[in-house]
A protein has these predicted regions:
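Histidine-anchored nucleotide/phosphate-binding helix
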Residues: 45, 68-80, 184-195
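Small/polar-residue-rich loop-to-helix segments that shape phosphate-bearing ligand pockets
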Residues: 91-170, 239, 244-265, 270
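Positively charged, low-complexity intrinsically disordered leader regions
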Residues: 1-57
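Active-site-proximal loop->helix
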Residues: 46, 71-118, 213-226
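A short, small-residue-rich loop immediately preceding and capping a beta-strand
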Residues: 54-75, 79-88, 172-180, 200
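Gly/Ser/Thr-rich loops at beta-strand to alpha-helix junctions
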Residues: 63-71, 91-93, 176-187, 281-285, ...
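Phosphate-binding loop/pocket of nucleotide- and phosphate-handling active sites
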Residues: 290-311
Length: 311
């Protein structure tokens, strides 16, 4: 049985500390505490799709040394028994956790002279074009709107959209961490297809990348997918100006990075019950909510855990 057969399994919604948590960190094919989360699901979706199309011999990718995507992609490649070529901008990759994990999963890791994610990705893309049967998995585990078909992008987001289906009926506020924003795009797509009956408010928490610097990216992707597939107007559901006067849902954007609260590199360790939040992502969100926005921590709030750190 391939990991592709697990893509529609619903991760649980649990109560901890008097509120709900959507545990997408429990999408963990190798067991809880290993690689996990929404982005892993999307990574597996792509590799599984390419494998089913036939003649897949390997996957090439590139990103900064701290990116969890290295371990995700390498593990998926090992599962499907294909090669994995990773480009990163460090000379000693085994000193970095996710690159070390990728190496243990069997990836071939090379260094780029320029360590920026864009440069690493470009080098990986060039390699994928040169080698028969290799596919390029884009930096941040995404599909560029300009370089991929509508059908491929819609399928990529639909695999995460399913997870909305078990949001409890009494949830009124949904809080979503936003980094590269592919997970939140999938979640909002799911809300449009399978509206949780009690949902009134959506809080987007910017923790870097698009979530802090270009939250309109989510609207652009939704419009590209939803308006073609469902014939619905994205703006009738979500107001990305955050005025919420004419949209179905009250939208709030809390931008943590770049506003003086924290930087991307900082880590904040937080826990509620037995949940240990990722210190670079969800941990910052929980700390911010406790310190600056406690009004959202209510019994009818659900916090979406996109993923947790590897133990």
């Amino acid at each position: 049985m391939t990991w592709g057969s697990k893509l529609r399994d619903l991760t649980p919604v649990e109560r901890h500390g008097g509120m709900y948590f959507k545990r997408d960190d429990k999408f963990a094919p190798l067991g809880y505490g290993n690689i996990n989360g929404s982005k892993l699901r999307q990574c597996i979706y792509l590799v599984d799709k390419w494998y089913d199309e036939g003649n897949l011999k390997g996957v090439a990718s590139g990103s900064v040394s701290q990116s969890p995507q290295h371990a995700f992609i390498a593990a998926a490649c090992r599962h499907y028994n294909v090669g994995c070529y990773i480009v990163s901008g460090v000379r000693k990759p085994l000193e970095h956790k996710y690159l070390r994990m990728a190496h243990e999963f069997g990836a071939h890791i090379v260094s780029s002279r320029v360590g920026y994610a864009q440069a690493c990705g470009a080098q990986a893309r060039k390699a994928s074009l040169a080698w028969e049967g290799f596919r390029y998995l884009e930096t941040n585990i995404t599909l560029d709107l300009e370089k991929n078909s509508f059908r491929d992008i819609e399928g990529f987001h639909r695999v995460g959209a399913w997870q909305v289906m078990n949001i409890p009926e009494d949830v009124e506020t949904l809080i979503i961490p936003c980094g590269s924003c592919n997970s939140v795009t999938s979640i909002l797509y799911g809300i449009m297809m399978y509206p949780p009956p009690g949902l009134k408010r959506i809080v987007l928490m910017g923790i870097g990348n698009m979530g802090s610097n270009d939250i309109g990216y989510v609207r652009r992707r939704l419009r590209a997918v939803v308006e073609v597939n469902l014939g619905l107007d994205t703006d009738e559901y979500f107001d990305f100006n955050f005025a919420s006067e004419n949209a179905k849902y009250d939208m709030v954007h809390l931008n943590l990075n770049g506003t003086g609260y924290c930087t991307y590199q900082q880590e904040m360790r937080e826990a509620i019950g037995d949940i240990r939040f990722h210190p670079r992502y969800e941990g910052k969100c929980i700390r911010y909510l406790k310190e600056r926005a406690p009004e959202y921590l209510t019994p009818t709030t659900c916090f979406w855990i996109v993923g947790s750190d590897v133990m």
